């Protein structure tokens, strides 16, 4: 019984000392950060869903032809108020990749939160998934460099000036 009390006490102590950020962050929050000003804008799932909707129907290396629905990156950036030359996209699993702004302009990539009408879950590419129109631009985009930019489980994007 004494061992149980010590384990309980230690558990409570470690829980109390855990980082506060873990308690503030909610799966589905998306933070856009500006590297230059260090300002940030966080979209909740609810505020993200109020932005203009965009769709891309395409295959990916991991999915058959699928209708992805979300918000164009142009609209996400406009709503955040940040501009730059590169987007550093970060995922929940700490994967990150840099996406040149010319991709946003040339291919109208989207930040999807639905797949075939169903909200993306973390175990299924969610909460957000960067999607390029691969089928519409097959000759240009069906290359490993672009596959590496199809980031799922996106939780933050840093707008960079370089």
Predicted regions located by residue number:
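Bacterial N-terminal signal peptides
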Residues: 8-16
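Bacterial N-terminal signal peptides that target proteins for export
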Residues: 1-8
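N-terminal intrinsically disordered, low-complexity segments enriched in P/E/S/T
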Residues: 22-162
């Amino acid at each position: 019984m004494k061992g149980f009390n010590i384990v309980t006490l230690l558990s409570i102590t470690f829980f109390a000392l855990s980082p506060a950020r873990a308690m503030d962050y909610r799966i589905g929050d998306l933070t856009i950060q500006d590297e230059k000003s260090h300002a940030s804008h966080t979209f909740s799932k609810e505020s993200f869903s109020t932005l203009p909707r965009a769709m891309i129907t395409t295959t990916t290396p991991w999915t058959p032809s699928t209708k992805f629905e979300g918000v164009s990156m142009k609209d996400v950036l406009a709503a955040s108020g940040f501009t730059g030359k590169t987007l550093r996209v970060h995922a929940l699993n700490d994967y990150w990749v840099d996406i040149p702004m010319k991709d946003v302009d040339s291919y109208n990539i989207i930040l999807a939160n639905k797949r075939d009408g169903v909200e993306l879950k973390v175990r299924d590419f969610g909460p957000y998934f960067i999607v390029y129109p691969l089928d519409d631009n097959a000759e240009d985009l069906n290359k490993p460099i672009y596959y590496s930019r199809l980031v799922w489980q996106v939780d933050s994007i840093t707008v960079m000036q370089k």
